[in-house]
Amino acid sequence: LPDGDVPFICGPVSPEDLVPVPDSPWVLAAGMEDDGYLYAIDARDHQSTVLFPTATYHSKPDAAFSSCGGPVTGGFQPHGLSLRSGSNGRHTLYVVRHGAREAIEVFEVDARSGTPSLTWTGCAAAPEGVRFNSVTALPGQGFAATHFATPVGRLWEWQPGAGWSEVPGSEWNGPNGLVSSPD
């Protein structure tokens, strides 16, 4: 029930991060509890729908992620989210994933009509010993992620054809959120 002017959203379990879907009433949420799910939340009526994993998920592997072994639905545990805005209601979603594998999972978001749908397109497995927290889309087709560690964490960058590289000078205590600018 609402508390004054503040409505509650029921459904997503342990939402860790949220991203709005451009030009739509939808917000995507990462629910990290137990196996974990990705949810679509309708900002108009505050209802939510599980998008991934489901029994009928779709995949269309992208050659840029050829080192990824394919989709793994169990032990998903999504954490940080970033959305690369596309055109005509199609976007790219980057998801920090824990559980069965530590990786950035990549999905195509189709928000052209009705509830958005996700198509898994690939993943970039984390370097050995790295546990990601936050992810951000970079200009071009790359992305960056924080390795949350104490006393010293760092920033990692992934680019097609090159894979992961540690960003020099990015070491700090417990890096968490991350956002990039268009330039």
Predicted regions and their residues:
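Blade-loop segments of beta-propeller domains
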Residues: 37-87
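Short loop/turn segments immediately following beta-strands, especially the blade-tip
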Residues: 41-44, 107-116
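Beta-rich catalytic cores
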Residues: 14, 34, 77, 100, ...
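Residue-level detector of Asp-centered blade-edge/turn motifs that repeat once per structural unit
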Residues: 21-24, 84-89, 137-140, 181-183
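Surface loop/turn motifs at the tips and blade-to-blade linkers of beta-strand repeat domains
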Residues: 7-12, 52-54, 70-73, 123-128, ...
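A short helix->beta-strand "capping" segment at the edge of beta-propeller domains
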Residues: 1-14, 62-64, 118
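Beta-strand-rich domains and repeat architectures in extracellular enzymes and scaffolds
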Residues: 5-38
